[in-house]
A protein has these predicted regions:
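Non-heme di-metal
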Residues: 2-143
Length: 143
C-alpha cells in the first residue's frame, strides 16, 4: 500500500497554506477564529495541527470515531458467517471483506488520533455506550 508524505519535497509551501506550518498560537482568539473562518471560506484545508475552535475539533473527533466504530461493528456479522461459508473460496472472500472493514476502522482511528484523542478513549466510549455507531448493524443478518 502506498502512502503520501505530509510534506512533499516537490511542492513548495505557500504563504498561508496549511503546509507552511501551524498557526501561531500566541495570537488573540478572535484573530485565530477569523483566520480559521477565512480558510473555510476559501475552501482551504484545515490540518489537524492547525488552530481550530474546540467545538469544531470535538465534532470532527465525534464524526470520525463514529465512522470508525461503524466500520469495526460492521465486520462482526460478516465474521460470524465465515464458519458457515459453503466453500473455501467463499470463506476467503468473507475473510477479505472482514479484513477490509477492520482496515477502514483502523485508518479512521488513526485519523482521529491526529486530532488529539487516544484510541483507548474512543474504544472506552464505544464500550460504555457513550459513543455511537451506525444502527443498521443492530438488526439480524440473515444468512
Amino acid at each position: 500500500m502506498y502512502t503520501q508524505p505530509l510534506k512533499s519535497p516537490l511542492q513548495a509551501p505557500q504563504r498561508g497554506d496549511a503546509r507552511s506550518g501551524p498557526e501561531p498560537r500566541d495570537a488573540p482568539a478572535s484573530e485565530m477564529q477569523e483566520r480559521f473562518e477565512s480558510k473555510l471560506s476559501a475552501e482551504r484545508k484545515i490540518e489537524p495541527q492547525d488552530w481550530m475552535p474546540e467545538a469544531y475539533r470535538k465534532s470532527l473527533i465525534r464524526q470520525i470515531s463514529q465512522h470508525a466504530h461503524s466500520e469495526i461493528v460492521g465486520m462482526l456479522p460478516e465474521g460470524s458467517w465465515i464458519t458457515r461459508a459453503p466453500s473455501l473460496k467463499r470463506k476467503a472472500i468473507l475473510l477479505a471483506k472482514v479484513q477490509d472493514e477492520a482496515g477502514h476502522g483502523l485508518y479512521l482511528y488513526a485519523a482521529a488520533e491526529t486530532l488529539g484523542i487516544a484510541r483507548t478513549q474512543m474504544l472506552e466510549a464505544l464500550h460504555s455506550g457513550r459513543a455511537k455507531y451506525s444502527s443498521i448493524f443492530n438488526y439480524p443478518a440473515l444468512t
